[in-house]
């Protein structure tokens, strides 16, 4: 089983943004991050999940996110009026795996969510 913690950040909305991912696997843990000069927090939240899913071979995994936008769009069928380009990529990746979705409260002391948050903000500051 693989656990993926994701977070997105934006300084201003829109503005410079970043995403961070913490991937926990049985024998290997690693971090990913990136950013964009002009984006939104929601785009960075979705991008974090996409990058996490793209970088694991495991078919059985749990994605943890503090974004109700991401979690509720995936699990409750919220309308995808914006960010269609990213939702299409995410839906394709999800269709290839068995993904369990878990919301985690942001800034609540969860070690891995906090690390993903630091990665995301670090990237946003670099832009």
Predicted feature residues:
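RNase H catalytic domain
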Residues: 3-16, 50-115, 119
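Catalytic-loop motifs flanking and including active-site residues across diverse enzymes
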Residues: 44-48
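RNase H-like nuclease fold core
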Residues: 1-43, 54-59, 118, 122, ...
């Amino acid at each position: 089983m693989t656990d993926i913690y994701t977070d997105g950040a934006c300084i201003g909305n829109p503005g410079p943004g970043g995403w961070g991912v913490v991937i926990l696997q049985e024998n290997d843990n690693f971090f990913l991050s990136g950013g964009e000069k002009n984006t939104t927090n929601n785009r960075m939240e979705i991008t974090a999940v996409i990058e996490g899913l793209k970088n694991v071979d495991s078919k059985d995994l749990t994605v943890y996110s503090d974004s109700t936008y991401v979690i509720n769009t995936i699990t409750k069928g919220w309308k995808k009026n914006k960010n269609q380009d990213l939702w299409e990529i995410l839906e394709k990746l999800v269709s290839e795996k068995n993904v369990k979705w878990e919301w985690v409260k942001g800034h609540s002391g969860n070690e891995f969510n906090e690390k993903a948050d630091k990665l995301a903000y670090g990237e946003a500051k670099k832009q």
